[in-house]
Amino acid sequence: MYGIEYTTVLFYLISFVLVSYILKTITKMMDYIIYRETFIIVVLSVLSNAQNYGINLPITGSMDTAYANSTQNGNFLSSTLCLYYPSEAPTQISDNEWKDTLSQLFLTKGWPTGSVYFNEYSNVLDFSIDPKLYCDYNIVLIKFASGEELDISELADLILNEWLCNPMDIALYYYQQTGEANKWISMGSSCTVKVCPLNTQTLGIGCQTTNVATFEMVADSEKLAIVDVVDNVNHKLDITSTTCTIRNCKKLGPRENVAIIQVGGSNILDITADPTTSPQTERMMRVNWKKWWQVFYTVVDYINQIVQMMSKRSRSLDSSSFYYRV
């Protein structure tokens, strides 16, 4: 009996020693592998910082120009540019190859073929609802039209900033704005927005909640309206629901990868006077209106200076000018 117990103890002791030896051997092997891989990674990282001839050399058709030899990415060689323009532009140009021509001209400014995308929009309303600002840099050309100054100005405020928006059910609820960054954005073919401020007893202040005719009108037959009311006061709203929608939005901050070029007009529209607009580099500019070819030539000529005032996109590819959250 004692012999069996001694044998059992001896078996477990030998097993423990054997397992310890195996684990120690495996540990040494793992240490060797880890140290070796670390050494290889360090050596490769050092070599990768060396000059890499030809990687960032733009092909312009001529090798006479001296280019700085660098391993850093060029400013535009890995970037995309979206150019948005009204539908009247290609109609006036009347040239099926005008985009190819502009692509070749952008190439002379350092933008490779295939990095510039041309996007047409029919009107301010359609563009404001779904702008599709997908590129690293987005430049919007807006033709100045008398009588549409307000729509253009509010479109600029919309797409030059990022917004977080919720749908509003004005038939069931009262709404209030909680700060300067909180606005109500209405869109449609014809938006008329009326409001009735309420006191703590939900009685109208200067208006009757049961009589829409007594409401104050804050937007009249507009395609796009960014409505601002007194903060921290409940309001009952009325809109032309058949031709308009309204959302409760909060301005998150500037969208620095978007710029607007106003085409024509005596003065450039200025949105920096808005108290919700933080001090920032001006990304609205104006070019003289002559012909659309002249406008595009001007854009190509100054494209790099324009982009210098912008910041490259940092959000997802599928980013619009406002986020719609249910």
Swiss-Prot record:
Q: Where does Ca(2+) 1 bind?
A: D95, G206, T214, E216
Report what the Swiss-Prot or TrEMBL entry states about this protein's PTMs.
N-glycosylated.
An annotated GO cellular component: viral outer capsid
> Any keyword Cell cycle?
no
The keyword Disulfide bond appears for this protein: yes
Which family does the record assign? Answer: Belongs to the rotavirus VP7 family.
State its role: Calcium-binding protein that interacts with rotavirus cell receptors once the initial attachment by VP4 has been achieved. Rotavirus attachment and entry into the host cell probably involves multiple sequential contacts between the outer capsid proteins VP4 and VP7, and the cell receptors. Following entry into the host cell, low intracellular or intravesicular Ca(2+) concentration probably causes the calcium-stabilized VP7 trimers to dissociate from the virion. This step is probably necessary for the membrane-disrupting entry step and the release of VP4, which is locked onto the virion by VP7.
Report the protein name in the record.
Outer capsid glycoprotein VP7
Which species is the source of this protein? Rotavirus A (isolate RVA/Human/Italy/VA70/1975/G4P1A[8]) (RV-A)
Tell me the classification of the organism that encodes this protein: Viruses, Riboviria, Orthornavirae, Duplornaviricota, Resentoviricetes
